[in-house]
Every structure is written in C-alpha cells, then in structure tokens.
Amino acid sequence: MIAKIEQLLKEVEALHASNAEELEALRIKYLSKKGAINDLMADFRNVAAEQKKEVGMRLNELKTKAQDKINALKEQFESQDNSCDGLDLTRSAYPIELGTRHPITIVKNEVIDIFARLGFSIAEGPEIEDDWHVFSALNFAEDHPARDMQDTFFIEAHPDVVLRTHTSSVQTRVMETSKPPIRIICPGRVYRNEAISYRAHCFFHQVEALYVDKNVSFTDLKQVLLLFAKEMFGTDTKIRLRPSYFPFTEPSAEMDISCNICGGKGCPFCKHTGWVEILGCGMVDPNVLESNGIDSKVYSGYALGMGIERITNLKYQVKDLRMFSENDTRFLKEFEAAY
C-alpha cells in the first residue's frame, strides 16, 4: 500500500495539462469515485491495524496534494481565459502606420549627398554660440545690423552668447582647429529674430560649404555651383550669378537658377523673370582667413550657403514655410514617395 501511495505522489507532483480537456481527464483519473486515490481508500480496510495510522496519513497527504495540484492547474487556465476578455479575434487588424521622413530631412540629405560625392565632409557645431564665432571671426563690423537685437537672439544675462544665425560659425571653429586643405559642409538649424509668416520663421535650416586650399579660384566655385544645381533640380537647369555683399566673402554673389516650374519662360512663382534665387556665395575674405589663423597669402577659398526650406519650396512648390514645423501628418504623408 505504501509503495502504491508513493508512486501516485510522484505522478501527482508531475501532473501537467495543456488544456481544460486534459485537466478534466486527470481529475477523473485521480479524484473521481472510480479514480486511483478512491481505489486506495477502498483498500484501506484491508491494511493491518499497526499500519493504519501511517497509511491513513499518507493517503490524506496524497488526496490533498492531488486536489491542490488540480486546483492550481484550473486557476492557471482560468487566468489565461480572463486575459482574453473583450478580445475579438474575428476583428480585422489595425493597419500599421509607417512613419515618413520629413521633407526638410529628405532635401537636406540630398544636398549632403551631392557635396559628399564632391569630396566634402560633414562638420557640426553648437547652436548656442558666442559672438566671436558668429560675428567677429567672420568680419562683421561692431555696428553691423545683424548684431542688432531685432535680428538676433541674445542671452539677456550674457550678451556675448547668442543663438547662431548661420552655420558659418561651424566654419570658423573648423578653421581654428584644422589646417588646409579644408573641404566641409555644415548642415544645421539656425535662428533669427523674425516674425513668423508664410515666408519667414524664427528658426530654419541651412547647409553651408567651405573649401580652403592653395590656388582656389572663383572658377572652382562656379563649377561646383553649376554641378549642384543640375544634380538638385535637373540637367536642364541654368544658373546665373549676381554681385552681392557679405561681410565674410569678397567678391560675393547671389546665385539664381532657371525657374524649374516654367522652365525659365516666366511665371508667377518666379515673378515672370524666369529666375529664382537659391543661395549666397563668394570667395572667403582674407580677413576671415587671418582671423582664424590661416595665411591668406598662401591659401584662398570659397564659401556658399543655402536655406533648406528654400530649396524644399522649389522642389515641391510648398508655398507656406510654417507647414514645415506644424507636424501636420496630412501634409507630411504627401512625401512618402519622395525617397
């Protein structure tokens, strides 16, 4: 009898059921009126008197453990069933919403890729800058309008600290710490103290380029600009350079491209001129080179800079700059096929 009880105890401890039907079969096998434990209870009357106490205790232990094991398995199945309450397995799955790249990111990466193929590497710098790297090192006079609080965000407690107004500050940091040849592009966000409207914003994105080496000429700059325009806007794109002024370049120019909407024939977008301005450029002023520790008698260079929002406007005919920062998913989904 003791041997049979020990054998059943081992079986009970190892009980396992994969579903409710298997559990019910185990209950019937061990705990029903015709079950194995009840059969042992019926044989208990035949146990010798001196063994009845020990056998009775072991039988009660077996029955208790079997009942506890069956109950534990039952609770396990019930908890699994409750976890699915309210779950309609026949309902169609929700569609998976895929994210898309922001149009500014798409165009910025395209600009970077074009210049990377020309051998330019990416350089980055802080958005919170000091006056030296934003203005003084770039040949801005003390009374230059860009230093005015109406154009630039200054930190009130520290007037020498500003939010950078252009990524040219990255160029000055690279020139301070690197020796020519220098061939970099500087993508990033910049800030201007301007009223927000359909054509202006208090922050926007720029990509600037700098090349400093021996015997760099304006011809080199023009060739890079032409290649960039054709890669960005199509092989039929034409460019023209108009004289301009920037404190950090001399000579300086504004670059226009033939309107990619009307093909240069004239339309409302280009104000019927056939041309659209996209960037500023020029040869690096010798004073800027000297301010950053580069001998202007040995080295020369060119710089150019463009607003990414402006380029994006031209590529996708977006008429309101504010749309780029409003996170309207209806607008952003229109660019799913743009990359």
Swiss-Prot record:
It comes from the Bacteria. GO terms for molecular function: ATP binding; magnesium ion binding; phenylalanine-tRNA ligase activity; tRNA binding. It is found in: Cytoplasm. The keyword Transferase does not apply. Keywords: Aminoacyl-tRNA synthetase, ATP-binding, Cytoplasm, Ligase, Magnesium, Metal-binding, Nucleotide-binding, Protein biosynthesis. It catalyses: tRNA(Phe) + L-phenylalanine + ATP = L-phenylalanyl-tRNA(Phe) + AMP + diphosphate + H(+). The keyword DNA-binding does not apply. GO terms for biological process: phenylalanyl-tRNA aminoacylation. Transmembrane segments: none annotated. GO terms for cellular component: cytoplasm. Mg(2+) binds at residue 250. Belongs to the class-II aminoacyl-tRNA synthetase family. Phe-tRNA synthetase alpha subunit type 1 subfamily. This is Phenylalanine--tRNA ligase alpha subunit.
